[in-house]
Each structure stands twice: as C-alpha cells, then as structure tokens.
Amino acid sequence: MGSISLSNSMPITRLPLLTSLYHQSFLPISSSSFSLLPLSNRRRSSTFSPSITVSAFFAAPASVNNNNSVPAKNGGYTVGDFMTPRQNLHVVKPSTSVDDALELLVEKKVTGLPVIDDNWTLVGVVSDYDLLALDSISGRSQNDTNLFPDVDSTWKTFNELQKLISKTYGKVVGDLMTPSPLVVRDSTNLEDAARLLLETKFRRLPVVDADGKLIGILTRGNVVRAALQIKRETENST
C-alpha cells in the first residue's frame, strides 16, 4: 500500500441517522449518532437480539481513586475512552490488491480492515470474508454445533478455499469492500456502541470525526477490556 498523506476533505453533510435498529431517517450527523446505509446495500444481513443488556457493565462507579483509570464523562464512558486510536490501526486503500490485503490480515492477525482514501476519509471496510468470498462456501459448511466435523467435508472446504485464493489475482479491495459502513463517533456513549456490536454481531465499528475521517476503531476486544476495567474500578471504589 502506498504512503498516505493528510489533507482536508469535503465534510459529510448528510448521513442516515440510526434512530433504531430497524428504522432510519436521513438527518445531518450529530456528535453522538451512528450512521448506516440501508441494509439492502450491505452484503450480509445481521441477526438482532433485542434482549441483550449491557448497562450493568458500563455504568460509571460513584467514586474512583485509580491513577490508571479512564475518567468517566458526564456520568458515563465514551467510545473515545477505549477505542484503538488511528496511529495503531492497520488500513488499506480501495486500490490495494486483494493479495496484499490478505497478507496484511495474516501478518497482523486481524479479520478486517478499514478502507480509506489519501485523506484518511473512511470509504469502506473489508473483511476476510469479503476478500475470499467465503459466503460462497460457508453455506455448505458443517453445522456450528458439530464438535467433530466430517473429515471429507472439512478437506473439501479447504480445497475450495485454496481455489478462492487462486482467483484473487488482479482484484483490488475496492471491488470487494463494503462501502459506507456503520460508524460511530468518539463521543458516542460506550454502552450504546457496545450494545450495537452485540446486537449486530459486528466485530468492529469504525470511529470517524465530523468530516468522516477515520480516527479509530472500536472492537469487541476493546469492549471486553472496558468492561473488565470498569468492573475493577467499581470493586475498588466500594
């Protein structure tokens, strides 16, 4: 991937505001909102579980005396308190070859990458599923509850995976990425973002600023770390 230079970009003026998990209205983006294109534009639908509760994990302790703790803001934590910042991210461009993106996934031991332009404006996300078109073989895989899958079936799937990799030559990330993904802001309430990750079953949420530039990523691992830290702080404050 070529070098990335920073410069000003056109601001995002209209993004769909996620008003609920099922209904959307088009409004100017606000400092604490999510954004999402209509689900018809996304490759795979998500399974929602409205019964999930995360409030208990992210309620700020009444008083904390810990120099290593992240301070609560307005009685709660925000995405910016626990996200992985931009300087620690691995990113690709639409022009990055699929082979290079796959090598980056393997080298960095991640399952997905933000896709940016030369100005760090987020233009999409791409996952290992996208890059290898794994949807084409996942439907024929063994049931997830099968602890010991059939050897012949597993070997057949592995062979199909090898064939998929052989077909990536000449393709670029822009051909396979998911454009205009669901995003959050660094000021978004952490509990809201955690609930969104749980209910959509996404692995990560890009974090953007008011101009749509990538400033971080909130992953499931970040949420687990936050829950553990807040639990310790709550215990220490009692």
UniProtKB/Swiss-Prot annotation:
Keyword Plastid: yes
Residues covered by the CBS domain: 83-145, 177-234
Organelle transit peptide: 1-71
Species per Swiss-Prot/TrEMBL record: Arabidopsis thaliana
Disulfide bond sites: none
Cellular localisation: Plastid, Chloroplast stroma
Keywords, alphabetical: CBS domain, Chloroplast, Plastid, Repeat, Transit peptide
Coiled-coil ranges per UniProt: none
Keyword Plastid in annotation: yes
Signal peptide per UniProt: none
PROSITE patterns, sorted: CBS (PS51371)
Protein's GO biological process: cell redox homeostasis
GO annotation, cellular component aspect: chloroplast; chloroplast stroma; plasma membrane
Main location: plastid
Pfam family of the protein (one): CBS
Protein name, per record: CBS domain-containing protein CBSX2, chloroplastic
